[in-house]
């Protein structure tokens, strides 16, 4: 912490700065979702093959999160964030001039390395800088920054790519990241590393059954979500037969719903933690199951995507908060594992969606994702049942 306690307005301004950084990182992580067709056309490739770029990015993050976090555990956090943004900006400049798909993937690998550390430390930094008693609201604000990436970043990036080319989209992200880096340098205080944990923390964390359960749940649910979401752009255009502008609208509404989900989380998660998570998982299950049946009805598909975005944001926030509560003594290590596993799910879902699209048809992506949510939901309810029985047996 800083030597003097900041005012509430200063504390919130610092959290907002982190939320802006989250907006930038989340925009670039998912921007390929809105540009798959354009990138595929540029390199004369199949959309399903270009989609593997999402898998490669996510799996680099999955592998690098813990390793990079441990390697940087002793670095002062403001300096670390500026270094991460420098790598981030240079990688996007390379993306903008990529002369073939291999170079584009290499440039995305640089972004993924920056990502792997950023999301390992951001949640704990937000909590650390939040005003007293406002931890959930600080996390909600970071989530809002992430959601705004879906509301503004992803649709805007798609529009820029549609009219000016996908390379200009990456240049625009690099410019935005430069502004964010300047804000971080000017507004954040010195942030010595605290409670980051060490390599010795890892086996201790994996001896906590509840934490391991959250980790497994994360992989399964995120895989289910990204089996369908990774290919929502070509799904809307080829399966639903709707125009490109409708795809942009859907991506916009999905992000808006994510903001609503973060607000609901801030308001209700403390009072109804289990009910909140189970309800969100039920909604996700319904959305994936109904994706194909509602694809022929634009209004129904729009409503489905609203509920889908709300549910997924709620699930992600609930699991992230649970990880932090179960590992307060090694929050950065715990979050790096969470980030890695989250991205393992992203990569697994994108790969599964690609294979489903190639071999079964893109219209099946929702049907393949839904059973995974059902498995996660059953495991959650079973865990709750066992916990209740254990409490009653001790009474």
From Swiss-Prot:
Q: Which GO terms describe its molecular function?
A: carbohydrate transmembrane transporter activity
Induction details: Activated by glucose, and to a lesser extent by other metabolizable sugars such as galacturonate, arabinose and melibiose. Repressed by cyclic AMP receptor protein (CRP).
- Alphabetical UniProt keywords: Cell inner membrane, Cell membrane, Membrane, Sugar transport, Transmembrane, Transmembrane helix, Transport
Identify this protein by name.
Sugar efflux transporter B
CDD domains, alphabetized: MFS_NepI_like
Naming one, the record's GO cellular component terms include: plasma membrane
What is known about what this protein does?
Answer: Involved in the efflux of sugars. The physiological role may be the reduction of the intracellular concentration of toxic sugars or sugar metabolites. Transports IPTG, lactose and melibiose.
The record's subcellular location field reads: Cell inner membrane
Q: Say which domain of life the source belongs to.
A: Bacteria
- How is this protein positioned relative to the membrane? Multi-pass membrane protein
Extract the HAMAP family matched here.
MFS_SotB
Instruction: Note whether Ubl conjugation occurs among the keywords.
Output: no
| Disulfide-linked positions | none
Bilayer-crossing residues are 15-35, 50-70, 81-101, 103-123, 136-156, 170-190, 209-229, 246-266, 272-292, 299-319, 333-353, 365-385
What family does this belong to? Belongs to the major facilitator superfamily. SotB (TC 2.A.1.2) family.
Ubl conjugation as a keyword of this entry, yes or no, is no
């Amino acid at each position: 912490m800083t030597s003097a306690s900041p005012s509430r307005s200063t504390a919130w301004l610092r959290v907002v700065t982190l939320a802006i950084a989250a907006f930038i990182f989340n925009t670039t992580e998912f921007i390929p979702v809105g540009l798959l067709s354009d990138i595929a056309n540029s390199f004369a490739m199949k959309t399903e093959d270009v989609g593997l770029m999402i898998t490669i990015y996510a799996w680099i993050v999955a592998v690098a999160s813990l390793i990079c976090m441990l390697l940087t555990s002793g670095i002062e956090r403001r300096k670390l964030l500026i270094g991460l943004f420098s790598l981030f900006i240079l990688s996007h400049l390379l993306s903008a001039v990529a002369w073939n798909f291999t170079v584009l993937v290499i440039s995305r690998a640089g972004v993924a390395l920056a990502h792997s550390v950023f999301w390992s430390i951001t949640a704990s930094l937000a909590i650390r800088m939040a005003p007293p008693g406002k931890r959930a609201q600080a996390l909600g604000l970071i989530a809002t920054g992430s959601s705004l990436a879906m509301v503004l970043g992803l649709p805007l990036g798609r529009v820029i790519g549609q009219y000016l080319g996908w390379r200009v989209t990456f240049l625009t992200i690099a410019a935005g990241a430069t502004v964010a880096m300047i804000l971080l340098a000017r507004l954040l205080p010195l942030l010595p590393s605290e409670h980051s944990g060490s390599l010795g923390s890892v086996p201790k964390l994996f001896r906590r059954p509840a934490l391991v359960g959250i980790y497994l749940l994360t992989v399964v649910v995120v895989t289910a979500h990204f089996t369908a979401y990774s290919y929502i752009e070509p799904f809307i255009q080829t399966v639903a037969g709707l125009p490109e502008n409708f795809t942009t609208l859907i991506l916009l509404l999905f992000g808006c719903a994510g903001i609503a989900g973060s607000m609901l989380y801030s308001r209700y998660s403390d009072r109804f933690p289990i009910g909140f998570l189970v309800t969100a998982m039920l909604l996700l299950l319904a959305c994936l199951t109904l994706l194909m049946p509602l694809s022929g009805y634009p209004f129904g598909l729009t409503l489905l995507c609203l509920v889908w975005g709300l549910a997924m944001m709620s699930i992600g926030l609930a699991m992230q908060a649970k990880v932090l509560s179960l590992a307060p003594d090694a929050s950065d290590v715990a979050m790096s594992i969470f980030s890695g596993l989250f991205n393992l799910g992203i990569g697994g879902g994108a790969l599964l969606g690609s294979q489903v699209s190639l071999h079964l048809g893109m219209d099946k992506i929702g049907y393949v994702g839904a059973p995974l949510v059902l498995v996660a939901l059953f495991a959650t309810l079973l865990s709750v049942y066992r916990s209740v029985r254990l409490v009653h047996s001790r009474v």
